[in-house]
From Swiss-Prot:
Protein family per UniProt: Belongs to the MoaC family.
Reaction(s) catalysed by this chain's protein: (8S)-3',8-cyclo-7,8-dihydroguanosine 5'-triphosphate = cyclic pyranopterin phosphate + diphosphate
Alphabetized UniProt keyword annotations: Lyase, Molybdenum cofactor biosynthesis
Organism of this sequence: Mannheimia succiniciproducens (strain KCTC 0769BP / MBEL55E)
Assigned EC number: 4.6.1.17
Quaternary assembly: Homohexamer; trimer of dimers.
GO MF annotation, one: cyclic pyranopterin monophosphate synthase activity
Name listed for the protein in its UniProt record: Cyclic pyranopterin monophosphate synthase
Active site residues per record: D128
Pathway involvement of the protein, from the record: Cofactor biosynthesis; molybdopterin biosynthesis
Any GO BP: Mo-molybdopterin cofactor biosynthetic process
Name of the coding gene: moaC
Amino acid sequence: MTEFTHINSNGEANMVDVSNKRETVREARAEAFVSMSAETLAMIVSGEHHKGDVFATARIAGIQAAKRTWELIPLCHPLLLSKVEVKLTALLDTNQVRIESLCKLTGKTGVEMEALTAASVAALTIYDMCKAVQKDMVISNVRLLEKTGGKSGHFKVE
């Protein structure tokens, strides 16, 4: 079994030393879902939400969150991201919004946490903007879809 990289021999949490790692192109994709009523989703899709463009706000929030992941997750490195993309899709058949994020850089450590943070914060932003009309929305299935680059290689959800 692979060992935890953020825990030293004394069991203490530490930031991983990436000084001697080589730079590679690294990319990660993550997703999250927000389930809601058909009425709430229709309000978002039609642009009739009183707070404005929910998708645009969630997209910007997700991008901003990816850039600030190192401030939110204690042992994450500050990264110079070369690309952050957040796509939101209304799934009318299931009354959900699907959020997919992509983060990319050339660096010494991966961008999985940045992609997961982008998707999560975009989902939280949708909840925040819509909670006045529906409080029982559900954020679910936040997960890493794919990552490339680095020593551990390629991972993709089956």
